[in-house]
């Protein structure tokens, strides 16, 4: 029984990281209707920013975190302006190819600057481990869960209650109509990318704290799985991203513990296929009908 509970806790830890990354994915898609497949690599950039700020520049961890989040937000703005804005009216395939290109560009730039060897991630803060019987709960697991839940609520309130949030919803519904109403579509989408990329910076902190080492390809697989989590929960749904991330992490850890680590990824993606066959919009996604 302790083994099962410990596995579920490990799944919550992994899933909360996926959920945090998926929140950025689903926010950008929900507002801009674009899939930023370079999102995972922005996490890698954020992690390297912390490493550089702490070990090279000698800055305190808290300052390094702020720099990392700000850098990720700025990088998101630059990527949107240079790579995605010119393709706003292009076919989805063109946007997809561009996103993959941006992803490889970031990975190779990191490879040139930091080399292929993994770098140790600094300890940001020492969190105590909670022991309950034969089960232990790592402090970083609790912190990630709490922060992810708080961010999910904050984003939901921001989108539904603030002026910019209402502008985002209007742009999501109809860009042309929003522009006619005086809403700056470019500014709204830029802010969306900035917030989504800042969330990637937050995810970088918790990913680095949990796995302690970073390499140029660090963000690739977590990015893909977080995208899977967003689709699983319902792409465009903020609560869906949270639910999808948690469930995906739990399924992956259960697969590794009770089936095989070799089959874990296949099982995760297999479950996604089954969910999409049964409910194409994801667990919390809403079916939208359009008049032609």
Which residue ranges define each predicted feature?
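Alpha-helical transmembrane segments within multi-pass membrane transporters and channels
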Residues: 25, 58-102, 109, 243-244, ...
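Membrane-embedded helix boundary and interhelical linker motif in transport proteins
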Residues: 9, 31-78, 82, 234
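Hydrophobic core segments of alpha-helical transmembrane domains in multi-pass membrane transport
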Residues: 47-51, 69-75, 100-110, 147-156, ...
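Membrane-interfacial amphipathic/re-entrant helices at transmembrane-helix boundaries
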Residues: 1-21, 49, 60-64, 90-95, ...
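Helix-loop-helix "hairpin" substructures at the membrane interface of multi-pass membrane proteins
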Residues: 14, 136-214, 238-244
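Short, non-helical or kinked segments that cap or interrupt transmembrane helices
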Residues: 16, 25-47, 61, 89-94, ...
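Transmembrane helix-bundle core of multi-pass membrane transporters
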Residues: 86-161, 188, 212, 254, ...
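Transmembrane alpha-helical segments in multi-pass inner-membrane proteins
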Residues: 18-20, 58-70, 193-200, 204-270
């Amino acid at each position: 029984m302790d083994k099962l509970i410990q596995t579920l806790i490990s799944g919550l830890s992994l899933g909360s990281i996926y959920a945090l990354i998926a929140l950025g994915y689903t926010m950008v898609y929900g507002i801009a209707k674009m899939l930023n497949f370079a999102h995972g690599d922005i996490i890698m950039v954020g992690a390297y920013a912390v490493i550089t700020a702490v070990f090279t520049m000698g800055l305190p961890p808290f300052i390094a975190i702020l720099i990392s989040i700000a850098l990720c937000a700025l990088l998101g703005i630059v990527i949107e302006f240079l790579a995605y804005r010119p393709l706003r009216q292009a076919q989805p395939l063109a946007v997809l190819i561009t996103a993959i290109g941006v992803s490889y560009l970031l990975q190779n730039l990191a490879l040139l600057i930091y080399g292929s060897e993994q770098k140790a991630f600094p300890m940001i803060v020492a969190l105590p481990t909670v022991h309950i019987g034969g089960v232990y709960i790592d402090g970083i697991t609790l912190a990630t869960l709490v922060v992810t839940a708080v961010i999910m609520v904050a984003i939901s309130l921001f989108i539904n209650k603030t002026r910019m949030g209402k502008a985002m919803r209007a742009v999501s519904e109809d860009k042309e109509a929003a522009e006619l109403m005086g809403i700056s579509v470019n500014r709204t989408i830029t802010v969306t990318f900035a917030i989504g990329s800042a969330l990637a910076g937050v995810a970088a902190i918790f990913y680095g704290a949990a796995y302690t080492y970073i390499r140029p390809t660090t963000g690739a697989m977590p990015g893909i799985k977080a995208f899977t989590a967003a689709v699983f929960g319902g792409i465009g749904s903020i609560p869906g991203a949270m639910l999808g991330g948690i469930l995906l992490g739990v399924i992956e850890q259960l697969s590794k513990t009770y089936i095989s680590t070799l089959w874990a990824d296949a099982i995760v993606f297999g479950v996604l296929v089954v969910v999409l066959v049964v409910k194409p919009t994801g667990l919390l996604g809403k079916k939208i009908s359009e008049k032609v």
